[in-house]
């Protein structure tokens, strides 16, 4: 439904590239199959991926790349209209229908990153966390970060916990979030 598509766009569009050297990455890859809908965005530094089951698929599996600018409009339309979203693929264009509203955009052509090979298949680190709790913890740590004082949030994943911290000229912040599993000391910085 529209709320699902809207959140999929929101959660992947931040990684859409603005670099015109690779125009195909200035959009998001949509893969439709019996398994559901997968939306992928990449910008050379980040990869954002979201999967959801689909209510109904007509025809076989297909994929396309939609421009990021068009997806921003689709997201806005989904916010205003509470209807089912229909996606129709043409040879060079994509039609998004939300209620009485239609948006037609051109497909981006080119070879999109093979994201399935970019993500390691086997990973010795396996953790489970509550995303709501993690986001709340992240918000608490981010209070010392501003547009002027950009600094990464460092996350250290250990046995049953992740420690998040940020340091800027205006102060330091630290918070601990409970997880299931052992992060084996994995440290990640998020901008």
Regions found by a protein language model. Give the residues of each.
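DNA polymerase processivity clamps
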Residues: 1-51, 55-108, 123-191
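Glycine-rich, pocket-lining loop/helix-strand segments that form or immediately flank
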Residues: 111
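Bateman (tandem CBS) regulatory domains
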Residues: 118-122
């Amino acid at each position: 439904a529209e709320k699902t598509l809207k959140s999929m766009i929101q959660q992947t569009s931040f990684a859409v590239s603005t670099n015109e050297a690779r125009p195909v990455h200035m959009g998001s890859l949509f893969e439709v199959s019996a398994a559901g809908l997968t939306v992928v965005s990449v910008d050379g530094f980040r990869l954002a991926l979201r999967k959801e089951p689909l209510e109904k698929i007509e025809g076989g599996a297909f994929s396309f790349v939609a421009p990021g600018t068009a997806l921003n409009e689709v997201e806005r339309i989904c916010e205003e209209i509470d209807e089912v979203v229909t996606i129709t693929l043409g040879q060079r264009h994509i039609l998004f229908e939300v209620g009485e509203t239609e948006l037609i955009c051109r497909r981006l052509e080119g070879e999109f990153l093979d994201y399935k090979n970019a993500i390691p298949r086997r990973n010795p680190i396996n953790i489970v966390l509550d995303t709501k709790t993690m986001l709340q913890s992240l918000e608490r740590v981010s209070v010392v970060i501003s547009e002027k004082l950009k600094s990464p949030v460092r996350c250290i994943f250990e046995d049953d916990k992740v420690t998040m911290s940020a340091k800027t000229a205006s102060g330091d912040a630290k918070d601990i979030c409970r997880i299931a599993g052992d992060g084996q000391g994995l440290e990640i910085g998020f901008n």
